[in-house]
Amino acid sequence: MTDTKQNTRISQFRFGQPKESLKLEHVALGALDKDKVRVHIEATNINPSDLLSIYGVGQYKHSHQPPRVPGFEAVGRVIESSNAEFAVNQRVLVATSGTWQNYVDVSPDDLFQIPQYLENGYACQLYINALTAWVLTTEVTKLNQEDVLIINAGSSAIGKIFSQLSVSLGFKIIIVTSQPKRYPTTTNWILDANADLVSQIKALGLPMPTVALDAIGGSPGTNLIHTLGNKGRFINYGTLSLDFYEPRFFEYAKSQAIDFSTFFLRYWEEAEGKDVRRDKFTTMLDHFITNGIQLDVDRYLPFDEVQTAIDLIESKTTRLDGKIVLLPV
């Protein structure tokens, strides 16, 4: 039986290597603030943003100062609440920082009701990547059957979501991946990230992309923008490379009158407000369930094996077929 008086959590005490900055702690649970809901976490995943926040890269160095508990999304059950919308035993998605712990006290604004039947590994992935992909395709770009989208990081979790949404929403997609032979799709519109993209598009007789979504930045982002023609649209939504764009990126963007912008889910949330965010999540969840959008899990590991999990994610030789999901201990 779970101890509801003690909380087990993964704490971050400083920026740097996870082995030196993370520690499993057991702390007493205090009284619940009257404006919060207490959730027992059932599963929480590891995203690139989690690792960036642990290392203290970019914006995370300023917005997520240690000491803190990492983790930005999870699934769990309400165990204590004075909020009318969230009753005890209600299953919820937790969309806030600090999810790598057994219990988390959350503002109702950061909780989303979800069906009881959704598997933990699926449910805990329904926010960061899923909502980002949904908002980018349906709101920011409003893709339709006339559009040709090109994405990089095609083998990533969000890359696989874009691929599935191209089928359910009806737009065309060209996928750039460093693992073209392992890509789980029947489409022929797969490009090798290690070869010239424009040459591959021509050789395969593919249409010219109208919209590009860049998750990497740096040199890969520069290569991606060169696939767009005059007045194309280029959106950066991630910097997995941790590198800046090369000068030729901006030279090409200017010469082709390309519409360049950035997208970060947190800024979109702040601009649109909590009601819009909740409406978009509800619409997205209905679409994902109705259309069988998959969110893959490679394996489940307990909190006390978080170092093993991070080693697997950062390994140059291990190929993961989905997220590593952390489970409370």
Give the positions of each predicted feature.
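NAD(P)H dinucleotide-binding glycine-rich loop of Rossmann-like/cofactor-binding domains
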Residues: 72-73, 91-153
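Glycine-rich phosphate-binding loop and adjacent beta-alpha segment
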Residues: 219-290, 328-329
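N-terminal Rossmann-fold cofactor-binding loop
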Residues: 176-180, 215, 238, 264
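Short amphipathic alpha-helix with an adjacent loop that forms part of the alpha/beta core around
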Residues: 196-207
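Glycine-rich beta-strand-centered segment in the early N-terminal region that forms part
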Residues: 28-45, 57-98
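Mid-domain Rossmann-like dinucleotide-binding core that forms the NAD(H)/NADP(H) cofactor-binding site
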Residues: 127-194
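Short, well-ordered loop/turn sites that connect or cap secondary structure elements
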Residues: 85-86, 143, 228
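C-terminal hydrophobic helical "lid"/dimerization subdomain
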Residues: 2-5, 40, 271-329
